[in-house]
UniProtKB/Swiss-Prot annotation:
Belongs to the universal ribosomal protein uS2 family. SUPFAM superfamilies: Ribosomal protein S2. This is Small ribosomal subunit protein uS2. CDD domains: RPS2 (cd01425). It comes from the Bacteria. Pfam families: Ribosomal_S2 (PF00318). The keyword Ribonucleoprotein applies. One of its GO terms (molecular function) is structural constituent of ribosome.
Length: 260
């Protein structure tokens, strides 16, 4: 594996340079803006390129050191791609709704995850003695928990770095990470607040093509980090590279998981 490459042309074609209408801007983003076109702020890709590269290396190095990455993106344009990228690289995600205390009250979240596992065991086991209504209620409860916690139920502890799409919508996630000293990699649009973001990436956080590109690059950086971690432990990642990506990621994730 190798760090994912990207070009200025790819960023342009994905619309990474398009910000919001000038009336919606955040003045704190002024240093990262190139100018205005048709009343829309244009993001300075000359800054985005090195900042994106720096962020990807931070993610890669975190994973190479055995760390976990939490992908966060709950808005409709990002939700599916965030989940797919995390699964593809054997990592974790929140793509439904950020629950208050998801990081800062991890003990309570762990209890909810335990409840989700218990329900899974109940529904896959013997349901004799339960009425249809009871089974339906339990199933609905499970679906609710799965939407909120399904992406982190195998995480086993706090993440070591966050990757965030849309810091305005995910403000609570950024604040909780800051309180715990967890580094944050985030896409910053022209209406974003860069405060609290350790590795900012100026770019469009709404366009589906742009989000797809970010997710592809971040998952690639994660897989490169997994490769480096396995290589450092004397294991051959070459065979895993020949597997489908999902299979390789699952194998790597299992290797990195703490013992029960």
């Amino acid at each position: 594996m190798a760090m994912p490459d990207f070009t200025m042309r790819q960023l342009l074609e994905a619309g990474v340079h398009f910000g919001h209408h000038t009336r919606r801007w955040n003045p704190r983003m002024a240093p990262f803006l190139f100018g205005v076109r048709n009343q829309v702020h244009i993001i300075d890709l000359q800054q985005t390129v090195p900042m994106l590269d720096r962020a990807l290396k931070a993610i890669r190095d975190t994973v190479a050191g055995g760390g976990r990455v939490l992908f966060v993106g709950t808005k409709r344009a990002a939700a599916d791609q965030i989940a797919e990228a995390a699964k593809r690289s054997g990592q974790y995600y929140v793509n439904h709704r950020w629950l208050g205390g998801m990081l800062t009250n991890w003990k309570t979240i762990t209890g909810s995850i335990k409840r989700l596992r218990q329900i899974d065991d109940m529904l896959t086991g013997d349901t004799h003695g339960l009425t249809k209504k009871e089974i339906l209620d339990i199933t609905r409860n499970r679906e609710k928990l799965e939407r909120s916690l399904g992406g982190i139920k195998e995480m086993g502890g706090l993440p070591d770095i966050l990757f965030v799409i849309d810091t305005n919508k995910e403000k609570l996630a950024v604040e909780e990470a800051n309180k715990l000293g967890i580094p944050v990699v985030a896409i910053l649009d022209s209406n974003s607040d860069p405060r609290g973001v350790t590795f900012p990436i100026p770019g469009n956080d709404d366009a589906i093509r742009a989000i797809a590109l970010y997710c592809e690059l971040v998952s690639g950086a994660v897989l490169d980090g997994i490769s480096a971690e396995l290589g450092a432990s004397g294991q051959d990642f070459g065979a895993a590279e020949e597997l489908p990506v999902d299979t390789a990621a699952e194998a790597a994730a299992a290797e990195a998981a703490p013992a029960a």
